[in-house]
Amino acid sequence: MTVQTLHHRFELANEANHPVITVNGCRICLDTGSPFTFKHPLGPDSLRIFGQESRLPEIPASRSQMEAGSEMLGFHFDVLLGMDVMAPLAWRLDWAAGTAEAAPTLPDEENTTWLPMPPSLGMAVSCPSCRVNEGQEVALFDTGAQLSYRIGTIPGTAREAGEAQDFNPQLGFFETTVWEDDLTIGGHTIPVRFGQLPRMGAVMLEAMGVSWLLGSDLLRAFRVTLDFPGRRLGLRPQEAS
């Protein structure tokens, strides 16, 4: 999909820790963890966004599974917008203000920390990555993840904080212990709540040397700029916005 070179603004909702915009009545979940854009089994066959209309493949999960997953997660979407559509643009997501912006370039803002954001796996449409904890660990940023996840050994500083259920179209339903800890990114220390992925989901990330899959924690803490064309991540603490 190609996009027109315009500055687009949307209302951004926090739907059960998922970023959702609405375009022409269509509820769209922004998901940097998905290489491709999909329709929900009950969603539209095509999507018009950024001046282009494209037919949408159906997400690789059954209707009953997706409906049960939506009920369990507490939110519903019509379209999962993946990196094939998001990657050509820079995005600025601000849950506190309820706004999302997308454009070929976005102006830099004061009080923003910029980090290199190379694409993981060396592919332009894969989940964006950055370094955390004084550069010692690699993290992927998945806006479609309601919970963050630790890949590998749980840090000794982490505190158990209960249990959680989660759902992923590829992994299905799963349960995890939830931990709480602090994470340092770009000189900022933020609290994170995280679980552990099922082995099938963790094995590839382990092979890539990934230690963290960061979900909604980043959007709660920062006004986030995902400058995909410039391959950089901008973090502006919410108290500075």
PLM regions and their residue ranges:
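Pepsin/retropepsin-fold aspartyl endopeptidases
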Residues: 1-241
